[in-house]
């Protein structure tokens, strides 16, 4: 198997197959669940809005997808600095049955000089997850832009108990970049290598996935990236990867997240 095909295979098994659109419906989520069981094996998770968790759980159980985790989003997509609302949303997501919660860090507050609210919000949401769900923290690196802010948001999130740090919501102009990945995984290497990393949005094909996996291997070791420590947040990426593996047709039309 070529290096590109190896990267494609690995990326599928590390994928949070995502639909976070305003026009999502039960049927779109059912279809997503079926897509998550690919000819190259299951994706690690699906990522959906909280209201769709029950139908996703029912569908995955029916199709033998019990091992596919259900991730959802809170404080999404704007990363507001109201801790109480973020906690209520996170508790509700866990009550719905989420295995994983992707919460948006209050990145605009950090840009305005407030480091405390981000730490406290992540800490409170981690407590709200309890033992029921893992917490991924979206720092919106494309808006933070400044390497020092990307580093600070990563450090605060890890110090507050994040299980993963994630680049992006996929709802802004700049999503996952190799530059942000380098900073974020450097912080992981310095602080706690059990914390995972999730690039989201903008990873379009096997070659791009291989670049992100290459940064992980260089900074954290060849065997570090597993579903417990690395995820790709993506929707259109799956079609490209299956095409690379000669298990699906080439993608048609404009490619989303």
Swiss-Prot record:
One of its GO terms (cellular component) is cytoplasm. Pfam families: DeoC. Pathway: Carbohydrate degradation; 2-deoxy-D-ribose 1-phosphate degradation; D-glyceraldehyde 3-phosphate and acetaldehyde from 2-deoxy-alpha-D-ribose 1-phosphate: step 2/2. Gene3D superfamilies: Aldolase class I. Its main location: cytoplasm. SMART domains: DeoC (SM01133). The active site is at 102 (proton donor/acceptor), 166 (schiff-base intermediate with acetaldehyde), 198 (proton donor/acceptor). It comes from the Bacteria. It is found in: Cytoplasm. Keywords: Cytoplasm, Lyase, Schiff base. GO terms for molecular function: deoxyribose-phosphate aldolase activity. Its EC number is 4.1.2.4. GO terms for biological process: 2-deoxyribose 1-phosphate catabolic process; carbohydrate catabolic process; deoxyribonucleotide catabolic process. It catalyses: 2-deoxy-D-ribose 5-phosphate = D-glyceraldehyde 3-phosphate + acetaldehyde. InterPro entries: Aldolase_TIM, DeoC, DeoC/FbaB/LacD_aldolase, DeoC_typeII. The keyword Cytoplasm applies. Catalyzes a reversible aldol reaction between acetaldehyde and D-glyceraldehyde 3-phosphate to generate 2-deoxy-D-ribose 5-phosphate. PANTHER family: DEOXYRIBOSE-PHOSPHATE ALDOLASE. Belongs to the DeoC/FbaB aldolase family. DeoC type 2 subfamily. This is Deoxyribose-phosphate aldolase. The gene is deoC.
